[in-house]
């Protein structure tokens, strides 16, 4: 019953107007300059036969020797077809489970995602990203954005959402462009889907909260509120551990209280910041559903206590007040704060997807310029690091050759 009330509340909250699509029927967020691959393609790279590199890696693994990061880098760099993507995936896995697994280079990860996009293998890119522990794929924000945008262009929001969840799990919301793209994907999915498992609610909640904390505007504060509401629901229904286990979230109880604190902060703010009615409706639906469910459970608990005697009741009186017992207070605070926000004109009626789309149009171009500049610096630094590795490899080979010749000469003289 409680779950159905929440779903109805969230469905009403999502009656928003979807943003207009491009004339071609597809949504384009990142500019052509951002996704352009010419600078990446024009970089200096070594040309090798993929079969020779694969054979070298196989022999090295068989001899139980470490494979160098240069070898796996060259293999990924020389992919030239969709079929070779599948072969390279195997060697990425093998390298991840080798002694040198910690030395998978950032440019190798970026190149892997680029190659997957180039040869229409986004599914492989996503698979290795989701299974990051097995493949070592921990991209930077620029690379995350490229993959996310590729799914948005195909209107594949399910996989775009999976990328957002991975950004959240890897705590990679430092860059504003990633925050904006992620929020756009999240609200696009929330506008269409009405039924969630508690795991999905937790993932949505965390993915809304973390970038929302970094956006100091109406979208950011509304995202915080929405995220706290979903996480608070999970906390009350599944327990606090379900919220923070294997998640980048704190293990301190009180997520619904934090949602109310967001309302208080916006109400007290002198800035022109509003909370979206959509997010407020979700929090209201969660509080009402949980409060009604709590009342029913209290009646059942009272019957159980009458049957079991007073000893258990005395023990319960010694237990610290729980979040469950605070629900009526939370609901009253919510109603009072909602009225205050309404009186102050701080409730935004426009939907979150529409607001986020406007924010993307306003801010993304500036964010792109910063990202592209950083990417170009990374390309230069990656090239310098690669040159150093190649020089070091040549020195080691020369040293090994000299040692071998010395040993051979010593044996001949003996």
From Swiss-Prot:
Coiled coil stretches, renumbered: 368-414
Cystine residue pairs: none
GO BP annotation list: cell population proliferation; mitochondrial translation; regulation of translation
GO molecular function, one term: rRNA binding
Mapped PPR repeat ranges: 105-139, 140-175
Source domain of life: Eukaryota
InterPro entries, sorted: mS27/PTCD2, Pentatricopeptide_rpt, Ribosomal_mS27, TPR-like_helical_dom_sf
Transit peptide location: 1-36
Location(s) in or outside the cell: Cytoplasm; Mitochondrion
Gene3D superfamilies, A to Z: Tetratricopeptide repeat domain
Protein function: RNA-binding component of the mitochondrial small ribosomal subunit (mt-SSU) that plays a role in mitochondrial protein synthesis. Stimulates mitochondrial mRNA translation of subunit components of the mitochondrial electron transport chain. Binds to the mitochondrial 12S rRNA (12S mt-rRNA) and tRNA(Glu). Involved also in positive regulation of cell proliferation and tumor cell growth.
Name of the protein in question: Small ribosomal subunit protein mS27
Source species: Homo sapiens
